[in-house]
Amino acid sequence: MNGCTSFSAIPESFSIYDIGPQGNSPVPVSVPLVGIDVVAPSWLSSSAMQYRLVPQHPLERRAYTNSRWAGMPSEMVRIVVGRVIEAQPATNGSGCRLRVDVDEFIQRFDTVDTSVGLIELRASLLAPRTDAVLATKAFAVEVPTPTADAAGGVIAMRAGVNQLAIDAGRWLAALEPATSGADSFRTRCSR
């Protein structure tokens, strides 16, 4: 019986957010892809909506008590990136993998009344069968929140993930054509 009393009741005003479909036009990519993997560090491997109060506690991560993500940030990023980047495997079924490392996914308060959604990630194009890195690029975005609360953070994070997915798609699209004499990324991803 005592074990049951340690569970707290779910607050009546508990909110679960996602970053939802955004109706973007896909970014066509000629580099053959067979998959998109999105990974995040352990502190981002939960549904907690995290924030940081820079003036008072710049090194402390906090989580909203009454608000959660519908899934882990890496899952939500994966869905958006997968919808935005339009790529197919090579005709032989081969293709590279896109690996996205989510390094930061947080609402940062610079004052009590102002905050931004901060997202940092690294995208790597991995060769078929070897996972050798063929190309890599870091991306970061800070989007001001319309309100300094969890709901405002969701709006900013949604816009930020969307922008980073488009940027990653454009980066992949810009990898073609190959520079002088080198195998193109399309060729290397088709082996």
Positions of PLM-derived features:
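Soluble periplasmic/extracytoplasmic beta-strand elements of cell-envelope proteins
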Residues: 32-39, 52, 97-103, 118-124, ...
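A structural "domain/chain start" motif
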Residues: 2-70, 177-191
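Mid-chain, structured segments of secreted extracytoplasmic proteins
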Residues: 59-87
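Short secondary-structure boundary motifs at beta->alpha junctions and helix caps
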Residues: 58-68, 130-177
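Hydrophobic alpha-helical membrane-association signature
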Residues: 77, 117-119, 160, 164
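Surface-exposed short loop/turn segments
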Residues: 5-22, 79, 83, 87-130, ...
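Sec/Tat-exported extracytoplasmic proteins
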Residues: 42, 73, 85-89, 109, ...
